[in-house]
Amino acid sequence: MKNRAIAFRFYLIIVFVLFLQNNVLAATVSPTSITVGVGASANISVTNISGTVRATSLDSSIVTVTYANGQATVKGVKAGTANITIRDRRASRTVPVTVTAALSVTPSSVSININASANVTVTNVSGTLRATSFNINIATVSISNNTITVRGIGAGNTSVTVSDNVSSATLQVTVNGTSNPPPVSGNYTLLAWNDLGMHCMDGVDFSVFSILPPYNTLHAQLKNKSGALVTSGVSMTYEAVRNDIDVNNVGTGRLNSYSTKLGTDKPKTNFWDYTGKLFGLRPDGEIGLNLDGLATGNPEAGNPSPSLTPMPMTYNAEYKWYEAEGIPVTPFADEKDANGYIKDFYPTVQVVAKDTSGNVLATATTVLPVSDEMTCKGCHASTTSTNPAQIAAKPSSGWVNDVNTEKDWKRNILKLHDERKLALPLYQEALSILNSQNSGYKTTGLLPTADSGQPVLCVACHASNAYFDKRNKKSVMNGLVDNTGKGLAIRPFTQVLHNKHASVIDPDTTQALNKSSNRTACYTCHPGSKTQCLRGVMGKATTANGDSLMSCQSCHGNMEAVGNSARQGWIDEPTCESCHNSGETNRRAISGVGDTTNGKPIVPADHTFATNADKPAIPGLHPNLYRFSTGHGGLQCEACHGSTHAEYPSLHADDNVQSIAVQGHAGTVAECTACHKTEPNTVNGGPHGMHTTGNAWVSAHQEANKNGSPNCTYCHGTTSAGTPLSAIKVAKTINVGEFGVKNWPAGYQVSCFSCHNGPNPD
């Protein structure tokens, strides 16, 4: 009996060992089933290997498999299902494989005209269908079910990548343009724009603190066909219209026609619940703040959110534009999904000019960009993470762990601010002054203040030129003063924020923000990864590998430069001529890049592409801001070139709708017939001393060249070989006499070598 018991135990041990070999210690595969498209490949990880591994397809007409170094690679051959087996010395594993038919597009290429569209059918879609245009200045693309609509924007060739979860296909697109864009119909041209290219706001919640309110500004100028500005006898209105695409250039048709709520809907923001406590102003819901006149205690009337009802704009004689200051548009569309209001960073409005009889003279469509992607939650949100960079901002007494995520990171910031500053006499003095001005502020700190129901306005202590009264040419947020009228030594908001965070380690890159030379550092706090604020012709420029040629630091310098005490935030800004001067490239916009000795814009001697000095004329300061500068025919620079950070042609197609409408292609409004009935003949009377273009210039340019005009280098380069500034915008046919007829495609850089052997041919 004893021997039988021993034998039985021995038997159990053998069974257990075999079980371990065949199961616990046997090879494992991940994933255990897989889907792959025809022609596509996928990998299967193999672990716990014992001995030689063999991988076999049970139907190689459907799927093939190879194995190397712990990884089996399967490749789809044709649609169907088949199993593959993966075996080692101990066990065999079976992996079911589904091969889906490759995604296909019909037709595989399209040829359309500018402003025309074509539909393309997509079949064999697996999962989510996506479509991306390689060049949105030539063609844009939108999706509806399994149909792609391609729209011609500018003449040229491009491609559209169509993909789903397992495969992709390429659609070739040709957009045909006319030799010259047709003149705008009618006798007027209307140009409208947003002043900054992107406005930021705090988002949904204003109950804890506020950096920036919803505040957007719309400008417009009207030209008649004699090229003169129309400044009287017209009315100007704006109204909400659906945009064409979202930030990813995918068709959405979003509408943003209110900023509070409709009926019993949840409000898009609680801003109007706190305007009185924050700013001492109490506009009705849907009416925004207006800083103009506030410096002298007489603010102008606020303007409403865009709606389906046209709202009036007013004429500003000083700046010679029609304006709607402080429009309180939010980054939330009227449409909702399961998470609430859908984000809409590019609300669209239509501006309409009418005569005194109500006849429409001209219309323009533009965006009022706004983003709440200006959050600090990446470092200040309560978290259980142990990432040293992510918890560096954790208050010593712990996170607040507020269940309201919109309030949580803000309360953490105030808690940390109190923790680090409350013992300082300057901080105590500031709290005392705030309390004397508004009893809602507590002398015990800013977090107790917010928790008691009084939201904190950051710029109440930290001066900011972002709050600018352009009527009185001064900031309305100049910091705190004591009872003797002396200002407290509290650093301005722009300076303190950039200096303080220059040494902060980005949790994602583990690099100090100041060390970064690309836009990821700025996009950590500024509207970035989703909004794509820096989207203009410079911001979208890339290398052959797809890397950005320019970043925020290219113009503004690093964070220490932006926060340098020598510069005035929002006043000392880089200017066009800082880089664009003397016909040379690779210029630097500001001093101190790398050494941060100054951080102020470089002012060259050459002002061909200059903004205007002392615009606006601020006493004691000498700004020359692009958004206040004018050029050819009294037009604002932004009217023709586009808003700051969104210079034409923009990466976001909705920005380009207006320039396409007035001249037939996306880009700087550069075609004379956009504003003039006929093309003027001039040697240097155009914008920036520009000459006439087209056939009329063929004979005239000879005299200009003989006179040794140095102006040629500004656009054609110091070697006269052409630059992007000499590129034509749409395909043109030019008769150059003895040199024949030239057919130049859009984008061709005209140079002396286009017809001659250089600038001084024999």
Specify the residue positions occupied by each region the protein language model found:
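Low-complexity "stalk/linker" and mucin-like segments enriched in Ser/Thr/Pro/Ala/Gly
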Residues: 29, 58-70, 105, 133-146, ...
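Short, hydrophobic beta-strand segments
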Residues: 74-76, 150-152, 314-345
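Bacterial N-terminal signal peptides
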Residues: 11-21
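Inter-heme linker and motif-flanking segments adjacent to c-type heme-binding CXXCH motifs
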Residues: 358-363, 384-390, 437-447, 465-762
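Ser/Thr/Pro-rich, low-complexity mucin-like regions
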Residues: 328-371, 383, 460-469
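Bacterial N-terminal signal peptides that target proteins for export
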Residues: 2-12
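Short S/T/G/P-enriched beta-strand
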Residues: 26-43, 93-117, 169-218, 223-255, ...
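Extracytoplasmic soluble-region selector
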Residues: 26-181, 225-247, 276
